[in-house]
A protein has these predicted regions:
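C-terminal scaffold of the Radical SAM
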Residues: 1-105, 109, 127-129
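Feature marks short, surface-exposed loop/turn motifs that line or immediately flank catalytic pockets
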Residues: 89, 114-117, 161
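Beta-sheet entry/capping signal
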Residues: 105, 151-154, 176
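A short, internal acetyl-CoA/4′-phosphopantetheine-binding micro-motif in the GNAT/acyltransferase core
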Residues: 111-129
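Hydrophobic alpha-helix feature that most strongly marks membrane-spanning transmembrane helices
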Residues: 113-117, 142-146, 169-170
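Conserved acetyl-CoA-binding loop-helix of GNAT-fold acetyltransferases
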Residues: 124-145
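Conserved GNAT acetyl-CoA-binding A-motif
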Residues: 143-157
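Active-site/acyl-donor-binding loops of N-acyltransferases
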Residues: 156-181
């Protein structure tokens, strides 16, 4: 699916509202395999998630470090689940003045498990839930944070998943679920 912006809402630059689709079609015609996250999501592929392996990618970003953790199929790199971990630089004083709950905290910016979308009224299989991707990604990110000298983890969590973090010793501080490491 494409998340188009209506052409009437584009104020400057190209007024093509389906630019991603056009670029993808052009690359497809040239037999270029797309390997961005959107094209590697499980979607309707038949990969077996029980064959997934964890992968950890580390890179420098904006006066800190980022870690991108994924559970991927070892054959074709299909992504079943991902987590983005931010280790802010220790000298980000202006951020800590505004958000003191983030002082000395590593931050889970995103965590997501992909599966097929369901039709209205269709039952969701609990199979995915029991694979434990989230639990393993969170535990791995906590270990990375601790090894890098952070003494707490903060998670930007939707209200309806806060119970999940509470079961893992997180508590609410302002808008973040926070845990001492």
């Amino acid at each position: 699916t494409y998340r188009d912006i209506p052409a009437s809402e584009i104020l400057a630059g190209s007024h093509l509202s389906n630019l991603r689709q056009l670029v993808e079609e052009k690359l497809h015609k040239k037999w270029v395999k797309l390997v961005d996250i959107r094209h590697r999501e499980i979607k309707d592929k038949k990969n077996n998630p029980q064959h997934a392996q964890i992968h950890i990618f580390e890179y420098d970003a904006s006066n800190g470090k980022e870690y991108f953790l994924t559970f991927e199929d070892r054959e074709d790199r299909t992504i079943f689940s991902l987590l983005r971990l931010r280790l802010p630089g220790k000298d980000n004083h202006e951020i800590y003045e505004v958000l003191p709950e983030l002082k000395d905290a590593a931050i889970i910016r995103e965590i997501h498990t992909f599966w097929d979308q369901l039709s209205v009224g269709e039952k969701w299989s609990i199979f995915w839930q029991h694979l434990g991707f989230w639990k393993q990604l969170i535990e791995t990110s906590e270990k990375i944070a601790k090894e890098n000298g952070y003494n707490k983890m903060a998670v930007i969590a939707w209200v309806w998943v806060r119970w999940y973090y509470e079961k893992r010793w997180y508590h609410l501080e302002w808008e973040y679920m926070v845990k001492s490491l």
